[in-house]
Amino acid sequence: LKLGVGTQSIGHSMMPSIITSEYLTDAPYFNLRVFSPIFNYNCNITQLSRKTHLYTHRIETILFKKIQFSFMEGVLPYGNFDLRMINPFSIYHGYGIFNEISNECSSFFGIKVNVTPIKYLRLYFLYAQNEHTMSSEEDKSIPEGSGFQLGLESYIPSKKGYFHIGCEFYYANPYLF
């Protein structure tokens, strides 16, 4: 259980993370984390302004000691603090809050994958989405908001330390966030 003010980053990358970057500084937050060697659950409430709170939860798992997979869901209602969002086992999209608050609510979805195929090499993929218009929706005025990061990095040992080599590709359409 953590209560504090500071940065919160999801996904270690060379450029700022497309999911949540360390450049969001001085934001008060409440964090509940439950973890084991193969499973991690994280519930987070970040206060962005007096009437704006970002509610997120994340589930992470490690498979075969080489693959880490994370799924994150979040909602950003513009209004007063909402007690319904404190339930750590809630699925935010199931509350119908989007119909209740109308256009004053944003959703968020993120995926993080880390793969370590061999020692000293890491491949990673980060995906973020905050808007998706279904083909069945009548109003097509809201544009898609998504982006991803793909990279690899290696720390090669030497006698006096490590050489850090990496490459990263970053794409975000203009309407992400």
Show where each model-derived region lies.
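"Short basic amphipathic alpha-helical interaction patches in structured regions
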Residues: 15-21
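Signature for the C-terminal beta-barrel architecture of outer-membrane proteins
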Residues: 9, 21-177
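Secretory-pathway/luminal and periplasmic proteins that interact with or process carbohydrate-rich
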Residues: 12
